Structure formats: C-alpha cells, structure tokens
Design a protein with these regions (language model features):
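Conserved catalytic-core motifs of GNAT/GCN5-like acyltransferases
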Residues: 122-123, 139-150
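A short, internal acetyl-CoA/4′-phosphopantetheine-binding micro-motif in the GNAT/acyltransferase core
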Residues: 86-96
C-alpha cells in the first residue's frame, strides 16, 4: 500500500536522484542543450525557509513518487499564498492506479493547512495529465510557450 509523507529536502534528496534522472529522461525538452543539473543549494535554502514542500509517495520504504511544490505569496496578489508545482513524478508501475489522485488530494489537504489559496500544476503537452487535474477539480488556466535561444 502506498502512503504519502511530507519529507525534508536534505533527508530525501539522495533517494530522489535516481527518480529525477528517470523523470528528466521521460519529459525534458532541449536535452541536447540542457542537462539535468539541479541547484540543490537553492532547494535546501527554500526548504529551510518554508517555501519548498516535498510530498513523497512510498510503497513500504521504497520511494515511488514525489511532488515538489513552491509555496509563497504571489507577487500580484499579496493577500494570497500560492502553491506552484515544480515537479511531480510517479513511477510508471504506479500510474493509472489510485496513487496520483490520492497524492494530489493529500497535497491539497496539506496546502489548505498551510493557508494556501491557489494550487497550480504544469505539464508537458506531450505527457499530459489533464484528465487527472480535471477529475480533481482543477481549472485549465493558461498556456505557456517555450523556445531555446542560447545558441
């Protein structure tokens, strides 16, 4: 049975690294130009200041998924705290089960406890999970475009 736990960055990051690699391989754009190179120091600072939230999905002791969220007051709406999804990943063997909706539901519960007004998720157009978001009561809010311009 999969359970969900809030975890601190410094205690989970080593376990997350193999899943981060799989996640990058599955969804990253511009792989020929941009390699996976997370700023772990920044994540640690954000965790220490309370603006980072990590929800782990575990089957027994095995990490099978994570949802990393940034929590902060929105610069446009200073009276409201937003929870902005950074990354969400569930091992392929646990997809199309109850794990994803249970994870989102647990995250919503935890964010409500923290005084969050709005939760946002983003997804790749070639790896959508719109049906999950709509099932969970989320509204499609905006589109985003991307273009690699460095070289």
């Amino acid at each position: 049975m999969v359970r969900f736990e809030e975890e601190k960055f410094e205690y989970i990051i080593d376990e997350m690294k193999p899943l981060l690699e799989k996640h990058y391989d599955e969804i990253a754009m511009y792989k020929d130009q941009i390699s996976l190179n997370p700023n772990y120091d920044l994540y640690k600072i954000m965790d220490d200041t309370g603006s980072l939230h990590i929800l782990a999905a575990r089957d027994g002791t095995v990490l099978v998924g994570y949802c990393v969220t940034f929590i902060n007051y929105h610069p446009h709406y200073k009276d409201h705290v937003y929870a902005v999804n950074d990354v969400i990943y569930i091992d392929p063997g646990y997809r199309h089960t109850s794990v994803a909706p249970e994870m989102v539901s647990e995250l919503e519960r935890l964010m409500m406890e923290k005084g969050v007004s709005v939760m946002t998720f983003h997804m790749k157009t070639y790896k959508p999970f719109e049906s999950l978001m709509e099932m969970m009561g989320f509204d499609k809010a905006e589109y985003m475009y991307s273009k690699y311009i460095k070289d």
